[in-house]
């Protein structure tokens, strides 16, 4: 297949119908609200006064919040300039973190789950002694997310998603006790059918199988009877945050995690979902670049905990009476590798942006180079400052983004960040064969990350995410080498974005950037 070949993106009929129905319902709700407001003209002064008071309260609350200025400013402007729309949107999606009830549920589950992980203090001391800058980051993760650092874990890096899928299928066939799978998107098509065939066989062998997916991420890929179909063949299946019309303060928080756990001994994570395009079975955006890792050993416990958190959080019953002990246990394993690995999770239910802080910490600690690959580049002032400051210090800072976008508007917003970065020495590359969906970073030949966390507001602030911090292991070298190979297939657009832009383009980009935090 030629690199520039593009194919239509397959969609399931029922999924598309449900999406269209939901959108129509939401539009009708908006029309209804506007109609009600219009008919209440006789109370215009009272409504106007109430809206202004509420707007003032929300703006003061935003000002006093711990959010970054990049997150506050769009909402402040929207609320002050368009009070009714701004207040409505902020109450719907801007609160970020759902209801108090949901926060309590997650806190309750975490209070039971996370203490079951060993603090591995000796391992933490070891990394602080041998690689202090990586140790600082590991300490931050452990103190603020309670996910420990591990050794005694073998890591396999996959530079193509299809290699990860092939390895997963082999390991799934060996499952004896349980299989946990959590993904943002599942497509009821060829790639999933390969997995489903194996899962059915393992169910017949007495293996407990759980599948968990995000409704919004999968809405165009699977039909509404998917859960019922899974349950019929013995697979326990749950849906995260079903997308329905109506007021839903939790709507904007999606499960973007990608995890497979087999018997608590083997785990997979990375950037790819379980849909055909991720494995280049179809090509809606040219070639697809995605990556992943396989863990075997002690560190898999953290992936198990991350899965159990989400699985139990969607059920009030499970949140109150969970039984985790049979899935979290120690077993004898002698790893061939000696490096450090730290799977971690990030949640919008707290006020700690673990994903962003790990990236910024790597940038700040880097002395020679710090490279990133991301499908989207929509970042806060804090991260922009860190990237630019590192480049000014003489650190080789590079970012790889797609050459063919999956969302053109978001792509334009991504490109709007280029000029502000390259003028300070950051180099930007666009992968010409297609869409790079991988989320990776590497610095100074000693530390790297691989996981689900994009360099955009949605991943860093709104979504449930997971990543894996690695230090002093072969996977770090392999990630660096993969990025070097990938850059060889890129166009270097650094010089192109050094020059000034037209007033019209600057105005358009300023508008897009202003509301980037809402994307």
Where are these regions (language model features)?
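Thr-Gly-centered strand-to-loop micro-motif
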Residues: 373-374, 401, 431, 450-451
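Helical hairpin unit composed of two closely spaced alpha helices linked by a short loop
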Residues: 376-397, 402, 407
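Short glycine/threonine-rich loop-to-helix capping motif typified by GTGT followed
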Residues: 385, 411-415
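Surface segments flanking catalytic/ligand-binding clefts of nucleic-acid enzymes
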Residues: 427
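Catalytic-core elements of nucleic-acid end-processing and repair enzymes
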Residues: 439
């Amino acid at each position: 297949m030629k690199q520039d070949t593009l194919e239509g993106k397959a969609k399931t009929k029922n999924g598309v119908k449900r999406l269209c129905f939901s959108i129509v319902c939401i539009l009708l709700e908006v029309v209804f609200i506007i109609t009600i407001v219009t008919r209440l003209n006789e109370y215009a002064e009272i409504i106007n006064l109430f809206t202004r008071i509420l707007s003032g309260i929300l703006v003061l609350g935003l000002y006093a919040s711990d959010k970054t200025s990049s997150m506050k400013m769009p909402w402040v402007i929207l609320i002050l300039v368009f009070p009714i729309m701004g207040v409505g949107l902020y109450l719907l999606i801007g609160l970020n973190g759902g209801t108090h009830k949901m926060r309590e549920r997650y806190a309750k589950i975490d209070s039971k789950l996370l203490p079951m992980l060993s603090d591995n203090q000796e391992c933490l001391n070891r990394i602080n002694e041998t690689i202090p800058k990586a140790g600082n980051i590991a300490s931050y993760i452990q103190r603020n997310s309670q996910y420990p650092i591990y050794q005694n874990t073998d890591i396999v890096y996959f530079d193509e998603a299809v290699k990860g899928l092939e390895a997963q299928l082999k390991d799934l066939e060996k499952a004896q006790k349980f299989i946990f799978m959590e993904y943002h998107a599942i497509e009821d098509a060829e790639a999933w059918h390969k997995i489903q065939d194996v899962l059915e066989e393992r169910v017949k062998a007495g293996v407990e199988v759980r599948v968990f997916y995000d409704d919004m991420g999968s809405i165009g890929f699977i039909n509404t009877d998917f859960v019922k179909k899974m349950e019929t063949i013995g697979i326990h299946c749950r849906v995260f945050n079903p997308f329905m019309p109506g007021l839903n303060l939790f709507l904007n928080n999606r499960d973007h995690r990608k995890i497979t756990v087999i018997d608590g001994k083997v785990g997979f994570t990375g950037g790819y979902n379980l849909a055909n395009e991720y494995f280049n079975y179809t090509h809606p955006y040219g070639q697809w670049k995605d990556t992943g890792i396989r863990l075997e050993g002690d560190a898999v416990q953290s992936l198990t905990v991350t899965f159990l958190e989400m699985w139990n959080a969607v059920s009030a019953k499970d949140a109150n009476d969970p039984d985790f002990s049979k899935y979290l246990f120690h077993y004898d394993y002698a790893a061939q590798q000696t490096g450090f690995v730290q799977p971690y999770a990030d949640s919008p239910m707290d006020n700690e942006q673990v994903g962003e802080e790990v990236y910024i910490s790597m940038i700040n600690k880097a002395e020679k180079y710090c490279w990133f690959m991301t499908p989207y580049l929509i970042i806060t002032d804090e991260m922009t400052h860190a990237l630019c400051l590192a480049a000014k210090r003489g650190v080789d800072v590079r970012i790889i983004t797609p050459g063919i976008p999956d969302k053109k508007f978001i792509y334009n917003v991504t490109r709007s960040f280029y000029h502000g970065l390259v003028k300070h020495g950051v180099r930007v590359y666009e992968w010409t064969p297609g869409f790079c969906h991988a989320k990776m970073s590497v610095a100074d030949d000693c530390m790297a990350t691989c996981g689900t966390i994009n360099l955009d507001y949605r991943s860093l602030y709104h979504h449930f995410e997971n990543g894996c911090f690695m230090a002093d292991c072969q996977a770090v070298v392999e990630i660096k080498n993969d990025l070097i190979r990938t850059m060889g297939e890129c166009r270097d657009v650094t010089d192109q974005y050094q020059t000034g832009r037209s007033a019209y383009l600057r105005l358009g980009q300023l508008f897009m950037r202003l509301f980037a935090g809402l994307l």
